């Protein structure tokens, strides 16, 4: 009985280690590194995503700017546009051009992002929380 308990505990520990590393392996990381004022009042948002080689990914970003006492000016964009991209296991750089309801102007913008990273078994959704950038 004691041997069975020890074997069961050992098997559970091994399973937890294996499954935790598999779950962590497909999880991606998303980092927004810059936001710059682009042509026509757009905002170019750059960043990186890193995920397990062979997984498929899609990134979306949102930009928000206050306009005095008026409602926010917002816009969003995604990368890639038509079909998911494939991870190489290394950080993948991206730049997404975002257009708002009206042209963005010099000043502070709030940028956030999320991604969908999928392998053959499941998907994860890494996020880049709200971060302020100064458009010049």
Task: Please name every model-derived segment.
Residues 2, 24-29, 93:
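Long, contiguous binding/interaction regions
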Residues 26, 92, 124-130:
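Extracellular and select intracellular beta-sandwich modules with Ser/Thr-enriched
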Residues 1-9:
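Bacterial N-terminal signal peptides that target proteins for export
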Residues 26-70:
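Short, surface-exposed binding/anchoring microloops in extracellular/periplasmic proteins
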Residues 10-14:
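Hydrophobic helical h-region of N-terminal Sec-dependent signal peptides
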Residues 53-120, 131-136:
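Ser/Thr-rich low-complexity repeats and stalk/linker segments
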Residues 15-22:
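C-terminal segment of classical bacterial N-terminal signal peptides
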Residues 7, 20, 33, 75-77:
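Intrinsically disordered, low-complexity segments enriched in Ser/Pro/Gly/Ala and basic residues
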């Amino acid at each position: 009985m004691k041997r069975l308990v020890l074997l069961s505990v050992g098997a559970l520990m091994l399973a937890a280690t294996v499954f935790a590393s598999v779950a962590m392996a497909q999880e991606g990381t998303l980092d927004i590194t810059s936001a710059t004022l682009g042509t026509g009042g757009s905002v170019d948002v750059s960043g990186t995503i890193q995920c397990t080689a062979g997984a498929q990914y899609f990134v979306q970003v949102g930009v928000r700017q206050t306009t005095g006492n008026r409602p926010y000016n917002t816009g969003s964009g995604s990368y890639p546009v038509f079909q998911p991209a494939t991870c190489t296991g290394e950080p993948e750089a991206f730049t997404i051009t975002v257009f708002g309801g009206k042209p963005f102007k010099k000043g502070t913008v709030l940028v956030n992002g999320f991604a969908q990273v999928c392998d053959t078994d499941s998907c994860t959704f890494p996020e880049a929380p709200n971060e302020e950038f100064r458009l010049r």
